[in-house]
């Protein structure tokens, strides 16, 4: 994958950064694509770095993700809550499945989506092979994750857990405005506020 470079002028000359490093200087972390262990490790490292730089200043997590591995997403979720720095979340494009959970996990009052973003929640999925006992163990783990994610989304959105259980039974797509009404985000953002925050 090609990563663009940006050149910055300073009193000491020019310095070239890859675009993600330059965004990191502005406390912007970009979560794009499927969430897996490698992506989670990169996002977590950036969150920890930015907290060490300034634990009181907002971190802006931009999300455009179809979701992915629940355990990798929960590692990001736990880190967002673990660090002191507030994490603002902004959905651009889509936040589906685990991406929607991370969007909703942002600091209350600082969870946003752009007008044409799509947000989708559903139950976790998985596959299993092997002996009947192994398949049963995996099925029980998926059901446990389903209950845990529904409780988390209920707490974060203000919806009753019974509604989450019903709505996540199948793919449940929402527009940005519908996600705001549901409580997954706090506002639909059409323009970036002055000051870049």
Swiss-Prot record:
Pfam families: CLP_protease. It catalyses: Hydrolysis of proteins to small peptides in the presence of ATP and magnesium. alpha-casein is the usual test substrate. In the absence of ATP, only oligopeptides shorter than five residues are hydrolyzed (such as succinyl-Leu-Tyr-|-NHMec, and Leu-Tyr-Leu-|-Tyr-Trp, in which cleavage of the -Tyr-|-Leu- and -Tyr-|-Trp bonds also occurs). It is found in: Cytoplasm. It comes from the Bacteria. GO terms for molecular function: ATP-dependent peptidase activity; ATPase binding; serine-type endopeptidase activity. The active site is at 97 (nucleophile), 122. InterPro entries: ClpP, ClpP/crotonase-like_dom_sf, ClpP/TepA, ClpP_His_AS, ClpP_Ser_AS. Its EC number is 3.4.21.92. GO terms for biological process: protein quality control for misfolded or incompletely synthesized proteins. GO terms for cellular component: cytoplasm; endopeptidase Clp complex. Fourteen ClpP subunits assemble into 2 heptameric rings which stack back to back to give a disk-like structure with a central cavity, resembling the structure of eukaryotic proteasomes. NCBIfam families: clpP, PRK00277.1, PRK12553.1. PANTHER family: ATP-DEPENDENT CLP PROTEASE PROTEOLYTIC SUBUNIT. Cleaves peptides in various proteins in a process that requires ATP hydrolysis. Has a chymotrypsin-like activity. Plays a major role in the degradation of misfolded proteins. This is ATP-dependent Clp protease proteolytic subunit. It comes from Trichlorobacter lovleyi (strain ATCC BAA-1151 / DSM 17278 / SZ).
């Amino acid at each position: 994958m090609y990563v663009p470079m940006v050149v910055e002028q300073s009193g000491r000359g020019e310095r070239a950064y890859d675009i993600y490093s330059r965004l990191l200087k502005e406390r912007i972390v970009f979560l794009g694509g499927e969430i897996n262990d490698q992506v989670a490790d990169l996002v977590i490292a950036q969150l920890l770095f930015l907290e060490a730089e300034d634990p009181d200043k907002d971190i802006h997590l931009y999300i455009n993700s179809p979701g992915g591995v629940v355990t990798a997403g929960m590692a990001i979720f736990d880190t967002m809550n673990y660090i002191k720095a507030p994490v603002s979340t902004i959905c651009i494009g889509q936040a589906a499945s685990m991406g929607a959970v991370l969007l909703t996990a942002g600091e209350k009052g600082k969870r946003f989506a752009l007008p044409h973003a799509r947000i989708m929640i559903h139950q976790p999925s998985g596959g299993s092979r092997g002996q009947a006992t192994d398949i049963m163990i995996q099925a029980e783990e998926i059901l446990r994750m389903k209950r845990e994610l529904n409780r988390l989304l209920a707490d974060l959105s203000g919806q009753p857990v019974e509604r989450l259980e019903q709505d996540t039974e199948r793919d449940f797509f929402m527009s940005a405005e519908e996600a705001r009404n549901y409580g997954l985000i706090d506002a639909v953002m059409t323009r970036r506020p002055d000051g870049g925050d």
